[in-house]
Amino acid sequence: MAFYSRGRRPLAEEEKSTDAAKARTRAMELLAGQELSSGQLYERLNRRYTQQTSAAVVAEMVQREYINDARYAETRAHALLAAKKSRRAAAQNLRQKGLAAGEIQQALDAVYTPDVSGEDPELEAAAALVEGHYRKKLEAGRRDLVIAALQRRGRSEERRVGKEC
């Protein structure tokens, strides 16, 4: 199915550019569009530029604080919580973005810990998910199906949510 390809074949290492100025410009273009982790930026730059050039440009972007993996991890964790993702699903998503385990743990601790009122944001998200998506199954008495669906989504509090609803 050739019509699905982007039309570009991967470049061989000897075909990749070593021009740091062009790589820097490309990095700025990518970062202007969306925030990226250092791993994501490196992967995208490495498609057109050599490994050394890509690594140098990423290091420069980190040094200039255009890229901050801790900030990216926390921002992404907030977005995942808003999307009603479990802590486990959020951790997996952040790992796929190329973030270090320490940054992931720190971001998840900041976002998913209970607030001063004692309310657990992950439990609230699970309850909202149950109320929205699985209300009809609960009304039909199929709590087992709801709990199984929550377990597939990586929830650990599904029993408490099932009893509350």
How would you name each of these model-derived features?
Residues M1-K163:
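An alpha-helical, amphipathic repeat domain used for nucleic-acid recognition
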